[in-house]
Amino acid sequence: NKWGGNTGRTMSGGVEIKALDIPKKLFATARLFEEGGSLTIVATALIDTGSRMDELIFQEFKGTGNMELVLDRKLADRRVWPAIDISQSGTRREEKLLPPETLHAVTLLRRTLATMHPVEAMEQLTAKLGKFKSNQEFIDLISGAHVMD
């Protein structure tokens, strides 16, 4: 709120309406590079704090990201690593990043893991991945077989 100026207009949660202008401009710079490389911005957000302001700020910036990695305390408490909630994590526009056969395998894998509890999903995934020399071997298996049998 300090840097946003004082317009007298606030959003829910008590945030001055212009307070997020500077951070939004910073995140927008990642899209401004045309044929000049790229800019990667890594940001973190603590959510589910009960604060309307925290939730508002998170929702404002959620749409600017290309990827979300959601950590799960239940996984960490059980010492399941990485403590990632697979069903809530992902990259937008995967179809532009992955070849069609890999995208198909990843989609099948995600659908299967989404039916499981997050702890079970990560335990299954890490156990299965541990049996292969490379991620590509695992993807090749998924492409030609039933997932997670």
Outline where the language-model segments fall:
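P-loop NTPase catalytic core
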Residues: 1-149
